């Protein structure tokens, strides 16, 4: 029965409209409860649709992997890639450069609501460019179009709101669709500038011994600005940071959209605290502090 429904949906490329509706439940994080920014939206979607999504996602991922589609610098939501493998790859680059006498500048990029603002028309073009056509393309087009959601707070339920952009939050296919969307970004980065992604988390870095090499990183930020403009995303300059590694690494100014990138002495990179000396003292101290706080509860 269920398999017949799935087969009919894939053959016709049409998903029941109710399957494209989601329920948003705001989950309180911390801070002032009257401030909406202190809530994390949890999106609940149709269970039956999620089963079908998982089947399609597995086959689609295999197709893309077999065709070597995914950029080697993307580590998010992919088999045999993770935050750990990304950090290991990054640290290998950093340590090798420092041992060779280079200093390193790293820019951490923050996109504003990246998953929610993906333009559907551009996403569809990229899906097609990835070699995805026929019934699967028709299904994906229907899946990401004409979606709506309601918000539930306590026993109160809002009316329907339509979504006009973004990959479906809370869905199984959403992360994969975003990877397809952002996959071409690393190709725009010059070869001498390092780039690492974990889904929408992006960092750019350059090893340098002179100002000319550092200027290349500033030019790369301009390339990134142009890419975001062409692809309908926005960078949040106030949430971007610059970290300077190496002995006597004189700080220089980097700019995004005419605004200076904030400098930092320590930053959380995929859960790991990295400081200017790559000593990991801050991370070790954080672990010790958390252990002391949790020990009495054991």
In which residue ranges do the predicted regions lie?
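Catalytic palm active-site di-aspartate
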Residues: 21-24, 40, 74, 104-114, ...
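Conserved pre-catalytic core of RNA-dependent polymerases
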Residues: 1-168, 207
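Hydrophobic alpha-helical membrane-association signature
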Residues: 90, 177-181, 217-220, 291-294
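Basic, alpha-helical interaction scaffolds
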Residues: 259-298
